[in-house]
Amino acid sequence: MTYNIHVGVGMDKKLDLPRIAKVINDQKPDLVGLQEVDRGVERTQHIDEIAELAKLTKMDYAFAFNLPYQGGQYGVAILSRFRILATDHRHYKNLREAERRGFIRAEVLAHGQKLNFVTTHLDYQYEDGRVFETEQLLKALENVAGPLIVVGDFNDVPTGGAYRLMRGSFADAWSMSNPNSEGLSYPADKPTKRIDYIFTRSADGLRARRGWIPETPASDHVPVVAELEIRF
Protein backbone atom coordinates (compact mmCIF):
# COMPACT_ATOMS: atom_id res chain seq x y z
CA MET A 1 0.00 0.00 0.00
CA THR A 2 1.17 3.54 -0.76
CA TYR A 3 -0.50 6.57 0.76
CA ASN A 4 0.35 10.27 0.70
CA ILE A 5 -1.38 11.27 3.94
CA HIS A 6 -1.02 15.06 3.55
CA VAL A 7 0.21 15.22 7.19
CA GLY A 8 -3.13 13.75 8.28
CA VAL A 9 -5.21 16.62 6.91
CA GLY A 10 -8.21 15.60 4.81
CA MET A 11 -10.17 17.29 2.05
CA ASP A 12 -12.23 18.92 4.80
CA LYS A 13 -9.01 20.66 6.03
CA LYS A 14 -9.22 18.80 9.36
CA LEU A 15 -6.29 17.03 11.00
CA ASP A 16 -7.53 13.53 11.85
CA LEU A 17 -4.94 10.77 12.28
CA PRO A 18 -7.47 8.19 13.55
CA ARG A 19 -9.26 8.65 10.22
CA ILE A 20 -6.01 7.94 8.35
CA ALA A 21 -5.43 4.90 10.56
CA LYS A 22 -8.92 3.59 9.81
CA VAL A 23 -8.27 3.86 6.07
CA ILE A 24 -5.10 1.83 6.55
CA ASN A 25 -6.67 -0.74 8.87
CA ASP A 26 -9.62 -1.25 6.54
CA GLN A 27 -7.25 -2.44 3.80
CA LYS A 28 -5.42 -4.89 6.13
CA PRO A 29 -2.02 -4.24 4.53
CA ASP A 30 1.24 -5.94 5.44
CA LEU A 31 3.40 -3.03 4.25
CA VAL A 32 2.56 0.66 3.85
CA GLY A 33 4.64 3.45 2.36
CA LEU A 34 3.61 6.88 3.66
CA GLN A 35 4.52 10.29 2.30
CA GLU A 36 4.08 13.76 3.83
CA VAL A 37 4.47 12.67 7.44
CA ASP A 38 5.07 15.15 10.27
CA ARG A 39 6.95 14.50 13.48
CA GLY A 40 6.75 17.12 16.22
CA VAL A 41 5.71 19.88 13.81
CA GLU A 42 3.76 22.92 15.00
CA ARG A 43 1.17 22.82 12.19
CA THR A 44 0.11 19.32 13.26
CA GLN A 45 0.07 19.98 17.01
CA HIS A 46 3.58 18.57 17.55
CA ILE A 47 2.24 15.03 17.14
CA ASP A 48 4.68 12.25 16.29
CA GLU A 49 2.46 11.13 13.44
CA ILE A 50 4.22 7.91 12.51
CA ALA A 51 4.42 6.73 16.12
CA GLU A 52 0.72 7.50 16.54
CA LEU A 53 -0.22 5.69 13.33
CA ALA A 54 1.93 2.71 14.34
CA LYS A 55 0.05 2.53 17.63
CA LEU A 56 -3.35 2.82 15.94
CA THR A 57 -2.52 0.18 13.31
CA LYS A 58 -0.45 -2.07 15.61
CA MET A 59 2.40 -2.13 13.10
CA ASP A 60 6.16 -1.71 13.28
CA TYR A 61 7.47 1.52 11.75
CA ALA A 62 10.43 3.43 10.36
CA PHE A 63 10.68 7.16 9.62
CA ALA A 64 13.10 9.25 7.58
CA PHE A 65 13.02 13.03 7.67
CA ASN A 66 13.65 15.03 4.55
CA LEU A 67 13.21 18.51 6.04
CA PRO A 68 13.31 20.21 9.42
CA TYR A 69 10.04 22.14 9.69
CA GLN A 70 8.39 24.27 12.39
CA GLY A 71 10.40 22.76 15.20
CA GLY A 72 10.01 19.18 13.99
CA GLN A 73 10.61 16.91 11.03
CA TYR A 74 8.79 16.20 7.76
CA GLY A 75 9.41 13.15 5.64
CA VAL A 76 8.47 9.64 4.56
CA ALA A 77 7.71 6.54 6.60
CA ILE A 78 6.97 2.84 6.49
CA LEU A 79 4.50 0.77 8.47
CA SER A 80 5.10 -2.98 8.55
CA ARG A 81 3.13 -5.95 9.80
CA PHE A 82 6.44 -7.80 9.70
CA ARG A 83 9.43 -7.16 11.93
CA ILE A 84 11.75 -4.50 10.53
CA LEU A 85 15.33 -5.77 10.56
CA ALA A 86 17.19 -2.76 9.15
CA THR A 87 16.59 0.59 7.47
CA ASP A 88 18.42 2.83 5.02
CA HIS A 89 17.61 6.46 4.23
CA ARG A 90 19.08 8.64 1.49
CA HIS A 91 18.54 12.24 0.46
CA TYR A 92 18.52 13.08 -3.22
CA LYS A 93 20.77 15.71 -4.74
CA ASN A 94 18.86 18.54 -6.44
CA LEU A 95 19.31 20.05 -9.87
CA ARG A 96 18.21 23.43 -8.52
CA GLU A 97 17.15 25.11 -5.29
CA ALA A 98 14.19 22.96 -4.23
CA GLU A 99 12.63 21.04 -1.37
CA ARG A 100 14.94 18.27 -0.19
CA ARG A 101 13.54 14.82 -0.84
CA GLY A 102 14.63 11.24 -0.37
CA PHE A 103 13.63 7.64 0.22
CA ILE A 104 13.58 5.11 3.03
CA ARG A 105 14.18 1.39 2.66
CA ALA A 106 13.18 -1.19 5.23
CA GLU A 107 14.38 -4.77 5.24
CA VAL A 108 11.68 -6.90 6.81
CA LEU A 109 11.31 -10.55 7.75
CA ALA A 110 8.27 -11.85 5.87
CA HIS A 111 7.32 -15.47 6.52
CA GLY A 112 10.91 -16.29 7.39
CA GLN A 113 12.39 -14.59 4.33
CA LYS A 114 13.95 -11.16 3.85
CA LEU A 115 12.09 -8.60 1.74
CA ASN A 116 12.96 -4.98 0.94
CA PHE A 117 10.29 -2.28 0.87
CA VAL A 118 10.99 1.30 -0.21
CA THR A 119 8.93 4.47 -0.24
CA THR A 120 9.75 7.83 -1.81
CA HIS A 121 8.24 11.21 -2.65
CA LEU A 122 9.55 13.00 -5.74
CA ASP A 123 9.73 16.63 -6.90
CA TYR A 124 6.29 18.01 -7.73
CA GLN A 125 7.48 20.93 -9.88
CA TYR A 126 9.99 19.78 -12.50
CA GLU A 127 10.14 16.65 -14.62
CA ASP A 128 13.92 16.81 -14.96
CA GLY A 129 14.11 16.97 -11.16
CA ARG A 130 11.99 13.81 -10.86
CA VAL A 131 14.12 12.05 -13.45
CA PHE A 132 17.32 13.00 -11.61
CA GLU A 133 15.87 11.76 -8.32
CA THR A 134 14.73 8.49 -9.93
CA GLU A 135 18.19 7.92 -11.36
CA GLN A 136 19.63 8.27 -7.84
CA LEU A 137 16.97 5.97 -6.41
CA LEU A 138 17.64 3.22 -8.93
CA LYS A 139 21.41 3.54 -8.48
CA ALA A 140 21.05 3.23 -4.69
CA LEU A 141 18.90 0.11 -5.03
CA GLU A 142 20.75 -1.75 -7.77
CA ASN A 143 22.64 -4.04 -5.38
CA VAL A 144 19.78 -4.71 -2.96
CA ALA A 145 19.32 -8.47 -2.70
CA GLY A 146 16.02 -10.30 -2.44
CA PRO A 147 12.51 -9.27 -3.48
CA LEU A 148 12.20 -5.48 -3.81
CA ILE A 149 9.06 -3.33 -3.78
CA VAL A 150 9.18 0.44 -4.39
CA VAL A 151 6.12 2.58 -3.70
CA GLY A 152 5.35 6.25 -3.39
CA ASP A 153 4.11 9.55 -4.67
CA PHE A 154 6.22 10.01 -7.79
CA ASN A 155 4.40 13.18 -8.85
CA ASP A 156 4.74 11.79 -12.36
CA VAL A 157 2.16 10.56 -14.84
CA PRO A 158 2.66 7.33 -16.84
CA THR A 159 3.96 9.30 -19.83
CA GLY A 160 6.58 11.06 -17.69
CA GLY A 161 10.31 10.48 -17.59
CA ALA A 162 10.50 9.23 -14.00
CA TYR A 163 7.80 6.63 -14.62
CA ARG A 164 9.51 5.44 -17.81
CA LEU A 165 12.81 5.09 -15.95
CA MET A 166 11.17 2.95 -13.27
CA ARG A 167 9.56 0.74 -15.88
CA GLY A 168 12.98 -0.08 -17.29
CA SER A 169 13.57 -2.58 -14.49
CA PHE A 170 10.34 -2.56 -12.46
CA ALA A 171 6.80 -3.74 -13.16
CA ASP A 172 3.79 -1.54 -12.40
CA ALA A 173 1.55 -3.51 -10.04
CA TRP A 174 -1.56 -1.52 -10.92
CA SER A 175 -1.12 -2.00 -14.67
CA MET A 176 -0.51 -5.72 -14.15
CA SER A 177 -3.69 -6.23 -12.17
CA ASN A 178 -5.92 -3.55 -13.75
CA PRO A 179 -4.85 -3.18 -17.40
CA ASN A 180 -8.08 -1.42 -18.36
CA SER A 181 -8.20 1.05 -15.45
CA GLU A 182 -6.40 4.39 -15.22
CA GLY A 183 -5.57 4.12 -11.51
CA LEU A 184 -6.19 7.80 -10.76
CA SER A 185 -5.19 8.86 -7.24
CA TYR A 186 -5.18 12.67 -7.03
CA PRO A 187 -6.99 14.79 -5.94
CA ALA A 188 -8.95 12.59 -3.55
CA ASP A 189 -12.36 14.17 -4.08
CA LYS A 190 -12.27 13.78 -7.86
CA PRO A 191 -9.08 12.08 -9.07
CA THR A 192 -7.76 13.23 -12.43
CA LYS A 193 -4.09 12.21 -12.17
CA ARG A 194 -2.19 8.99 -11.69
CA ILE A 195 0.93 9.82 -9.67
CA ASP A 196 0.99 7.20 -6.87
CA TYR A 197 2.55 3.83 -7.71
CA ILE A 198 3.51 0.38 -6.50
CA PHE A 199 6.48 -1.05 -8.40
CA THR A 200 7.99 -4.52 -8.13
CA ARG A 201 11.42 -5.37 -9.47
CA SER A 202 10.89 -7.37 -12.64
CA ALA A 203 13.76 -9.78 -12.00
CA ASP A 204 12.21 -10.89 -8.70
CA GLY A 205 9.14 -12.43 -10.33
CA LEU A 206 6.61 -10.79 -8.02
CA ARG A 207 3.07 -10.98 -9.36
CA ALA A 208 0.26 -8.54 -8.67
CA ARG A 209 -2.85 -10.62 -8.07
CA ARG A 210 -5.13 -7.60 -7.68
CA GLY A 211 -5.05 -3.88 -7.01
CA TRP A 212 -7.60 -1.41 -5.72
CA ILE A 213 -8.01 2.25 -4.82
CA PRO A 214 -10.24 3.02 -1.81
CA GLU A 215 -12.39 6.12 -2.06
CA THR A 216 -11.69 8.32 0.95
CA PRO A 217 -11.38 12.06 1.71
CA ALA A 218 -8.99 11.46 4.63
CA SER A 219 -6.09 13.01 2.65
CA ASP A 220 -5.72 14.94 -0.60
CA HIS A 221 -4.59 11.66 -2.23
CA VAL A 222 -6.35 8.31 -2.15
CA PRO A 223 -4.24 5.26 -1.30
CA VAL A 224 -3.23 2.65 -3.85
CA VAL A 225 -3.22 -0.97 -2.69
CA ALA A 226 -1.95 -4.16 -4.33
CA GLU A 227 -1.99 -7.80 -3.33
CA LEU A 228 1.33 -9.29 -4.37
CA GLU A 229 2.33 -12.92 -4.73
CA ILE A 230 5.96 -13.43 -3.79
CA ARG A 231 7.76 -16.67 -4.56
CA PHE A 232 10.72 -16.98 -2.22
List where the protein language model places each region.
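Active-site neighborhood of phospho(di)ester-bond hydrolases with catalytic His/Asp-centered motifs
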Residues: 33-35, 62-65, 149-153, 172-175
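Active-site-proximal beta-strand elements of phosphoester/diester hydrolases
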Residues: 1-9, 88, 105, 114-122
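N-terminal, active-site-proximal structural segment of metallo-dependent hydrolase catalytic domains
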Residues: 1-56, 68-73, 135, 230-232
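Loop/turn elements at helix/coil->beta-strand transitions in domains of secreted/extracellular proteins
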Residues: 28-30, 58-60, 113-115, 145-148, ...
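Metal-dependent phosphoester-hydrolase catalytic domains
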Residues: 107-109, 128, 132, 142-148, ...
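Active-site metal-binding loops of divalent metal-dependent hydrolases
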Residues: 3-5, 37, 120-122, 153-154, ...
